[in-house]
Amino acid sequence: APQEPNQFQLLKYH
């Protein structure tokens, strides 16, 4: 699901 945060999103959106 695209709504669930992945490690990439967490790292980029930190």
UniProtKB/Swiss-Prot annotation:
The keyword Secreted applies. It comes from the Eukaryota. One of its GO terms (cellular component) is extracellular region. Keywords: Cell wall, Secreted. It is found in: Secreted, Cell wall. This is 33 kDa cell wall protein.
